[in-house]
Amino acid sequence: MAEYVNYVLGSLYVSDTATSTIPTDVRNFIAPPFPLNFWSGPTFTVRSNTRADPLKLVAARHRAAAAAIDTLEAQSQYGVANVDALIRPLERQVAKVADALAALEDAARAAESADAATPQVNASEADQRPDNIGQSLSEIQIAKNDVPMEFDTNLAVDLLATVFVSRAAGGSNGVVFGTWYRALQDRLVTERPVATRSIDYRDGRMSKTFMTTAVVSLQSCGRLYIGNRPYSAFEAAVLCLHLAHRAVNSNYTYPTSFSGLIEQLPVYIEAFSTALGDGTLGKVGYEFNGARLPKNQFHVPGGGGRYERGALNGHGVLETLIRLKVLPAIPGSLGTTSTAVGPELDADQTAYIDDVNKAAAAFLVRAQNLFLTEDQTLLRSTINTITALLLLRRLLWNGNVYTDRLRNNFQLGAIVPNLAVSQRDARGASGGDAAAMVSRSGNNNFTFLCERYVSPIYIANREVELTQLFPGLAALCLDAQTVARDQPQHRAVNVSTGRNQTNLTRLIGIELENRRRTAPVPINEVLAAHDAVALQYERGLGLLMQKPRLRASLEETRRLGQFNVASDYDLLYFVCLGYIPSLTSAM
């Protein structure tokens, strides 16, 4: 039998199929010669050697895996080389930046050394002791019967760190600051748990991070964060008080430097307090016209310089400054800009002469104008600063720091290490000493504070505000809403401190959250929280100044006791630090 199929007509050309006749036959299928035994070949039948195929498959897989490993190794070596080539230029740039930063630090250190070596010009008593100026930059004294203390950048924060370090030396964190701070921390833990992840409040302890943030937040109540101003509200307030004193006292020897003006603040405040009562027939008001002020905003809206007309009216401090011609008339109060002030209102044509700007040029010498009536945000803050100084004078009036030391909750000897108190400075150590010193101190404590505390801190930091100097005063003002709700005949003690400090809790929470977030809280939210606290502080100033028996009302309602204040000595340190620490035994 032939190996290939034989066609009936033999082979044909496909091109001839149109003219050729192909008989019908099953074998006449046009196809190439096809093997007859193709389908029975070994390709389509089961092979007899079944063990050789898996071995070949495994060997092929091994070879493929080895090839893949070799490829990956080559790629990794190539990638390492590329990464090294990319990192080396970055490392060189980082090294250059580090060198530049080191050079800047050296230059800043040299500048600080040069500034420290530059002699300062002071006045009054400071004019007579120039050798002590460099020492006063970092040395302050709060109470007469205590030794001076040196601080770094922020006295309240530095001393707070010392408090926790001294207590932790015994392996314990038993430090308390009163029920007010306890309620504030508990409310923060409850309402803003995200913010409290960075504080340690285990077993009911007071957190150092929380206390530091709270004190800094209290110090920020009187600061202005919008705008670039060459003068602070504290500086403007001192200049206004100085000019007011000159207006009511013609025969007086005045200092020749701004630090000398600060030391004379008690005298200026005393004269201004008298002028406040002389200029009004009724009760002196310490609040602005809230109906015309912007809601929930401290600064002038829209970035302008003026509030709505009449917004600042009604405040006794501002009216007294205008009456004494310390400040010119508020723009628009004596007529429009297109109409000149008539002789019947301003015979000497001096209504708009600003002596504050002249005083700033004489004492501060910064070649910058200071027109408070044009920057009414600064004017508002200045009025609040003067009001706070009046309140501070009332709080410290006739305070006795020489009472029995064991009656004081604040013990400096338990906080400051190696405190060597001489016998001369240890007055008030026994009840007998206190009995021998029953005479009224008047304004002596405030005077000593301005000379040995306020003036040195201002020399060290020219941009300091009053709330940074007295955070405890800011805390009392924020707590004034609680005092305002107490009725005269209502004897129940109000312990709901936390709910009245929603604004402060919010500001503290935002500050703590910003320390943990990679993306900080938007600046608008931070400014809104700060303005809310500033407005509450301003309202508290007015409420406390309206109380005729301020110290008695605060003691009767236990508002001072919630801050651990038990004596005049404690109150003096509280207004300066913002807290009174008490060390407790471990449980």
Curated annotation (Swiss-Prot):
Q: Which subcellular locations apply to this protein?
A: Virion; Host nucleus
Segments for region (Disordered): 113-132
GO BP term, example: viral penetration into host nucleus
Is Electron transport given among the entry's keywords? no
The UniProt entry's GO CC annotations, sorted and at most eight, read: host cell; host cell nucleus; viral capsid
Q: Which region ranges are annotated with the description Interaction with major capsid protein/MCP?
A: 1-53
Highest taxon, organism lineage: Viruses
Give UniProt keywords alphabetically: Capsid protein, Host nucleus, Host-virus interaction, Viral genome packaging, Viral penetration into host nucleus, Viral release from host cell, Virion, Virus entry into host cell
HAMAP family cross-referenced by the UniProt entry: HSV_CVC2
Indicate the quaternary assembly. Answer: Heterodimerizes with CVC1. Interacts with major capsid protein/MCP and triplex capsid protein 1/TRX1 at the pentamer vertices. Interacts with the large tegument protein/LTP.
Similarity comment text for this entry? Belongs to the herpesviridae CVC2 protein family.
Give the protein's biological function.
Capsid vertex-specific component that plays a role during viral DNA encapsidation, assuring correct genome cleavage and presumably stabilizing capsids that contain full-length viral genomes. Participates in the interaction between the capsid and the tegument through interaction with the large tegument protein/LTP.
- Name of the protein this chain belongs to: Capsid vertex component 2
Gene name of this polypeptide: CVC2
